[in-house]
Amino acid sequence: MNASPKIYSPKELLQILTSAIRAEEFSVAHGQHCIIVDARDLRTPMRLKQLPNCPLIALHPDSTFNVATTVLSDFDCVVSEQELEPVIAGIRAQPIAASTLCHLLRHSQNLTIEQALTAESMAYGLLQSSVGFRNWLATR
């Protein structure tokens, strides 16, 4: 990695996301590819009212997230320290695709299958016309 990403505490995340203006700064458009939160000591869900416009990653020793456990349910991804670097590298390589995927999955949770497929098709079509996709395709 070029530089170690900042790892936020749950309290810092809440402070960021309580301000719509500050929350907006956490997006690919502002050069923020993801937010990493040290979630080792979380005991209850954060119940975030809004999510950032970039992937929200929980750093947790047990990355085998159990869907029955809702403590980490606000996060897009749960990784251990060993898994963090490859995940960050993937996000940095394709930040728009990573952000699009997170938004698609967040949005699709409460949709019908038909609505979710429409949203997925729109996202996929837009990504296929992106510079990032063309660059990736050229390396294949």
Protein language model features and the residues they cover:
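C-terminal alpha-helix plus adjacent terminal tail
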Residues: 1-140
